[in-house]
A protein has these predicted regions:
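Conserved beta-strand hairpin/beta-sheet module of binuclear metal-dependent hydrolase folds
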Residues: 1-51, 147-159, 164
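Short Pro/Gly-enriched beta-strand edge/turn motifs at strand-loop
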Residues: 2-8, 107-108, 128-131
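Metallo-beta-lactamase
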Residues: 38-39, 132-139, 143-209
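Divalent metal-coordination and catalytic microenvironments
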Residues: 6, 24, 34, 44, ...
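Active-site HxH/HxHxD metal-binding segment of metal-dependent hydrolases
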Residues: 37-43, 49-123
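Internal catalytic-core helix/loop-beta-alpha segment
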Residues: 116-139
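Residue-level marker for buried hydrophobic side chains located in beta-strands
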Residues: 31-33, 62, 87, 155-157, ...
Length: 209
């Protein structure tokens, strides 16, 4: 689903789950925000082809956090996809993503996905891609959870800091949130943003509420 020019909400299905990575692109490059479950690299390629963006244009991956449904296809992407790709994540989730520590919510997984994080992001940082991507450190769901704000299209990419149902925001998903108080504080960072669209990884697009 097109959110704005050069901003596409992808839809991936895995068992009973529907998840929504985001693809940003312009004439020069593309940015993928989150990579789905393990084994979904082919699904991502299909979605990119649907949008009309070649995988060869993919130069940047931004991971909102360490959970397996967000980092799952990172290894395949790095091995089979693109050369010299930059992978961004917050320092507090980096060691989990790289496999140095067991994933906080997926300790039962014997061989969890892992991949090299090339670049660390910090709160308030602006990445110079596709019109500018502002990083918001929004811990609670995980220690290093980040959300992204696209000023050009007034779009908030909320990751798992919130969920939505049928276009309505549902707030924090308590059962999968490690620190509820932190998560509540994180939501306050959104109050001063000029937001027209919110995309939740679980639930998809919400507008005007």
């Amino acid at each position: 689903m097109e959110i704005a020019k050069g901003v596409e909400m992808l839809q991936l299905e895995f068992q009973e789950f529907i998840i929504h990575p985001i693809l940003l692109w312009n004439d020069e490059m593309a940015v993928l925000i989150d990579t789905g479950f393990p084994g979904q690299f082919e699904d991502i390629q299909v979605e990119m082809k649907r949008v009309g963006v070649s995988v060869d244009k993919l130069k940047v991956v931004i991971l909102t956090h360490q959970d397996i449904d967000h980092i799952g296809s990172l290894p395949d992407l790095l091995e089979n996809g693109v050369s010299d790709i930059k992978v961004y994540a917050h320092e507090l989730d980096k060691r989990y993503i790289e496999g140095d520590l067991p994933l906080l919510k997926d300790v039962h997984v014997e061989n969890p996905p892992k991949g090299k994080v090339s670049d660390i992001v910090i709160d308030g940082q602006e990445l110079p891609y596709c019109g500018g991507i502002r990083i918001l450190h929004t811990p609670g769901h995980t220690p290093g959870h980040i959300s992204l704000y696209l000023k050009q299209s007034k779009t908030l990419i909320a990751g798992d800091s919130m969920y939505s149902v049928n276009g309505k925001l549902g707030g924090i998903h308590a059962p999968t949130t490690l620190n509820i108080m932190e998560a509540q504080q994180s939501l306050k960072k959104y109050l001063n943003l000029d937001i027209e669209s919110v995309v939740c990884y679980h639930g998809g697009l919400s507008k005007g509420n």
